[in-house]
Amino acid sequence: MTTDINGTALAVFIFFFVLVTVMGFVASRWRKPETLAHIDEWGLGGRNFGTWITWFLVGGDFYTAYTVIAVPALVYTVGAYGFFALPYTIVVYPFVFMVMPVLWKRAKDFGYVTAGDVVHGQYGSRGLELAVAATGVIATMPYIALQLVGMTAVLKALGLHGELPLAIAFIVLALYTYSAGLRAPALIAFVKDIMIYIVVIAAVALIPSKLGGYANVFASADAAFQAKGSGNLLLGGNQYVAYATLALGSALAAFMYPHTLTGIFASNSGKTIRKNAIMLPAYTLLLGLLALLGYMGHAANLKLDSANDVVPTLFKTLFSGWFSGFAFAAIAIGALVPAAVMSIGAANLFTRNFWKAYVDPDVSDAGEAKVAKITSLVVKVGALLVIIFLPTQFALDLQLLGGIWILQTLPALVFGLYTNWFRAPGLLAGWFVGFGGGTFLVWDAGWKPLHLISLGGEPFTVYTGLLALAANIAVAVVVNALLPAKAPVRA
């Protein structure tokens, strides 16, 4: 289970992990309500998070441990194309500023907890509600599993191998999430985000000085790409359209996920959400700096088993033991916060849009909270089992599909905020075409999220999620136009 352990790094790592564990259990008494036996309190923190709590929570939830590992890994592998995450996390915030306060008000006014609640309230359709809820759950499961991939990379760099350390970390996470609900990741997010800022700023300031400066970093990366015949410091060929459509599609999908919507619904006002849409791009700046670590991996001449090892190996090689332990703790804690919120978001969906809708319509508030707590445990265990017993590539493929799938819920969730013209049968038909068609196109392309199309005789590579969304909307419009008019049902 252990090899090549740096005692100082491990001690620092354990200290911060224990610190956030204590904070997780203390969180049940932070901003304590009369009772946590209500899904509004356990699953949404009482809908009372202000600007700063929301900023740390959404930032900690959106910019995950896997982001810290995967973005530099992608840049290390393909170069400039890996920077698509920057425009994606810029374009998303005007969308958040305009749409999310409207969605928050709808949820607040009618007591909705999930996207499925909003859809059922707008259209009165259990079928459409179930489609949206099921999509949210299955898109979230691999996302949680990938947080474990990020944590595994860190544990490996610490010299801890095997499943036991990972299982212990997730058991601890499960226990304090069960106890405190959304308050636990909200409180821990303060520590996680501050630690990540310190690590990334220190890395981009100190590491280049040890590698001959940024000129040498870029020159080394360019030489590495030229030597292997793939990747580049600049976009080329037909990458521009692929880059732009991937960024746009990812931006539209980002706040359709249950975990990001949970952060929105937990806010105390639409004004808080708008302030966060203005402030959250600070994390995008951090992400841009983080991506540069991929180029630094080439300058450091790292020998890697996997591109996902570039950040942990870089820190282990170039930082002192105590700071590498601090950095590894920041990344590991960066897995705990989003994993907790994701499991809560998935649990809320199951409880409200399956259990209450089909199993026990008269379930009490306390019963709802109990079902959500148990479901959150099951979700975490499921994600852990995926990583332990299935190839990591399985989780990666599912996550790739998850982004395309969750994007297909946008018409049902967002269009009804602005117009009553659309109706459930059309939206459900559109969802089915987008979901099925997007899945087929990804499979047909060899499990790649990009598809080659021809316009005016010119070939373009386009993000499959946007193609599926276009088909989704087109089908919804056509079917809706053929249906007799019917007033919306909002309850």
From Swiss-Prot:
Inhibited by CCCP, but is apparently not affected by the concentration of sodium. The chain crosses the membrane at residues 7-27, 55-75, 83-103, 130-150, 157-177, 187-207, 246-266, 277-297, 322-342, 374-396, 400-422, 427-447, 465-485. Induction: Transcriptionally regulated by the two-component regulatory system MctS/MctR. GO terms for molecular function: transmembrane transporter activity. Keywords: Amino-acid transport, Cell membrane, Membrane, Plasmid, Transmembrane, Transmembrane helix, Transport. Its main location: membrane. Pfam families: SSF (PF00474). The keyword Nucleus does not apply. InterPro entries: Na/Glc_symporter_sf, Na/solute_symporter, Sodium:Solute_Symporter. It is a multi-pass membrane protein. One of its GO terms (biological process) is amino acid transport. One of its GO terms (cellular component) is plasma membrane. The keyword Disulfide bond does not apply. It is found in: Cell membrane. NCBIfam families: monocarbox_MctP (NF046076). Belongs to the sodium:solute symporter (SSF) (TC 2.A.21) family. Low-affinity transporter of alanine and high-affinity transporter of lactate and pyruvate. Can also transport other monocarboxylates such as propionate, butyrate, alpha-hydroxybutyrate or acetate. May be proton coupled. Required for optimal growth on alanine or pyruvate and ammonia. This is Monocarboxylate transport permease protein. It comes from Rhizobium johnstonii (strain DSM 114642 / LMG 32736 / 3841). The gene is mctP.
